[in-house]
Amino acid sequence: MGALKLVFVTGNANKLREVKKILSTDVSSEDSLKIEVDSKALDLPEVQGSTQDVAREKSRAAAKLIGGPCITEDTALCFKAMGGLPGPYIKWFLEKLGLDGLNKMLQGFSSTEATALCTFAYCEPGKEPILFEGATEGNIVPARGPTNFGWDPIFEVSGTGMTYAEMPAEQKNSLSHRSKALDKLRQHFSRR
């Protein structure tokens, strides 16, 4: 099977590196679809809503701007004790509160459970986006590991005893919310 080339609309170098790594190493057989990713950074409007709403609108706008098919991503970190917040607003919560502040949000609650959610959207100009979602369960903990990739140091994956930041890249990429969403994307294009 040949290679599919996709444009990933992101300005986040860490996300791009991780997506390329996941898609280049997660090929289970010679017949599996290989996906090559290029990136383009665009200033897209950030709509408010669910990760699905955000991913749909970002991908529509991006496909129109670049004049071709593309993928976009929206990520959420949903605290069970807070009914799913900060959810898709995690980027702004992290910028304003920092890792320690996110932990403090859960003080007084009995649960530190959280879901990491990733929604990729594939869109061609003038067409409806196709969504691919992945989720990983875990808990919010005091920061452990390198602090150079968003909220990775405070999200401890259930059953591992480690935060995303503490894991070797191969381990994180085998069980992360992002890898689960990308696996669904790969399956979709493998069936085409």
UniProtKB/Swiss-Prot annotation:
Cofactor: Mg(2+); Mn(2+)
Reaction(s) catalysed by this chain's protein: ITP + H2O = IMP + diphosphate + H(+); dITP + H2O = dIMP + diphosphate + H(+); XTP + H2O = XMP + diphosphate + H(+)
UniProt superkingdom: Eukaryota
Signal peptide (residue range): none
UniProt-annotated binding residues for Mg(2+): E46
EC number in record: 3.6.1.66
Keywords: Cytoplasm, Hydrolase, Magnesium, Manganese, Metal-binding, Nucleotide metabolism, Nucleotide-binding, Nucleus
Description of how the protein assembles with itself and partners: Homodimer.
Physiological role: Pyrophosphatase that hydrolyzes non-canonical purine nucleotides such as inosine triphosphate (ITP), deoxyinosine triphosphate (dITP) or xanthosine 5'-triphosphate (XTP) to their respective monophosphate derivatives. The enzyme does not distinguish between the deoxy- and ribose forms. Probably excludes non-canonical purines from RNA and DNA precursor pools, thus preventing their incorporation into RNA and DNA and avoiding chromosomal lesions.
PANTHER family the UniProt entry points to: INOSINE TRIPHOSPHATE PYROPHOSPHATASE, INOSINE TRIPHOSPHATE PYROPHOSPHATASE/HAM1 PROTEIN
Protein name: Inosine triphosphate pyrophosphatase
Organism: Puccinia graminis f. sp. tritici (strain CRL 75-36-700-3 / race SCCL)
